[in-house]
Regions:
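Non-heme di-metal
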Residues: 2-344
Length: 344
């Protein structure tokens, strides 16, 4: 038997050896240096910005309670698509207290982990402050209705798997579940904010949402790096969580009143649709992790990795089917607009 044959045999055996099953406490300890390193990296590249710099305050005026005029639909300068997308993004950001609780419970508030959780929360809070100020000052939405939606959304909270929210398998039962979910979710949110800015067709809104989307991208990189490090420590456990998250993925704003209807408007308008979810979120992250190239996944982990192909195939079909439906919908809308114009 040649030396190369022996080496190949040993390598093959290594790939079938059961891997250590880490507890969340052990993973928190193993990943702590990575968290500290990436927090420092994040702070080094983060560009400070202030919400008040991107609000056209000169357009503002008192509402009726202070002797001014209450909101009127004619005051809105945004398209229906931009308005729906802005409201959905804002209400999603409004649930930050619930997200903070989920992250803090699945991570820890001790040491570098706690430093990151609090920094992430502080940066995220800017987003709702800025978007709300913009919408209220420019009178782009009904502020009374917006406040009612905020209260209802926050009362519902964000507790996947509890209070009949989203089913038992939708979100995080473990540390890996949590970091895998936010790796995809933060990137999805970045895409949504960026495209909402374009849909607004208004320079100040576009600049504001560019800053917010940049924040989300940096958050995604942090969490993506956590999963990447986790794949080196416990590849089978990590790929199992990645599979779970992708097989049950939904955006965190799913508790928003009218979310399904708004999601259709947002998708049809090209802000965030099945194709962008696949091509701009799922596939780039999986490529970065080299999921299908790794040679350290075996046993149960290999089954979950192979089944990712089924999930991706399903996402491709969903994207293709949606494009067909979207085309027919837009054609109907165009014909309706022509008929309305002919009556004028």
């Amino acid at each position: 038997v040649s030396l190369s044959d022996t080496d190949n045999s040993t390598e093959s055996e290594d790939r079938t050896v059961p891997q250590k099953e880490y507890t969340d406490l052990e993973l928190l300890h193993e990943l702590e240096p990575v968290v500290e390193e990436n927090t420092h990296r994040h702070l080094g590249v983060f560009k400070e910005w202030n919400p008040h710099d991107y609000i056209p305050w000169s357009e503002g005026k008192n509402y009726k309670a202070l002797g001014g005029q209450d909101w009127d639909p004619e005051q809105c300068k945004l398209s229906e698509l931009a308005k729906v997308a802005m409201i959905t993004n804002l209400l999603t950001e409004d649930n930050l207290p619930a997200y903070h609780r989920e992250i803090a419970m699945n991570f820890t508030m001790d040491g570098p982990w706690g430093t990151w959780v609090n920094r992430w929360t502080a940066e995220e809070q800017r987003h709702s402050i800025a978007i709300r100020d913009y919408l209220v000052v420019t009178r782009s939405v009904d502020p009374v209705e917006l406040e009612k939606l905020r209260v209802e959304q926050m009362t519902r909270g964000f507790s996947p798997g509890q209070n009949r929210q989203g089913g038992d398998h939708m979100f995080a039962d473990s540390l890996f579940d949590s970091v895998a979910y936010v790796s995809f979710q933060e990137l999805a949110t970045r895409v949504s904010h960026r495209n909402t800015g374009v849909a607004c067709a208004e320079p100040i809104a576009q600049e504001l949402l560019k800053h917010i989307s940049n924040d989300e991208n940096l958050h995604m990189i942090f969490y993506r790096n956590m999963v990447e490090a986790g794949l080196e420590i416990a590849p089978n456990q990590a790929v199992k969580s990645i599979h779970k998250v992708l097989d049950n993925f939904t955006m965190p704003g799913y508790t928003i009143p009218g979310f399904r209807r708004n999601a259709v408007t947002i998708a049809t308008g090209g802000v965030y649709d099945p194709q962008s979810h696949l091509a701009e979120v799922v596939q780039p992250v999986l490529r970065k992790w080299r999921i299908f190239e790794r040679d350290d996944i075996n046993g149960e982990g290999e089954w979950y990795r192979e089944d990712l192909h089924r999930i991706i195939t399903g996402l491709k079909k969903t994207a293709s089917d949606f494009e067909e439906v979207k085309t027919k919908y837009l054609e109907r809308q165009a014909r309706r607009a022509e008929r309305m114009a002919a009556k004028v």
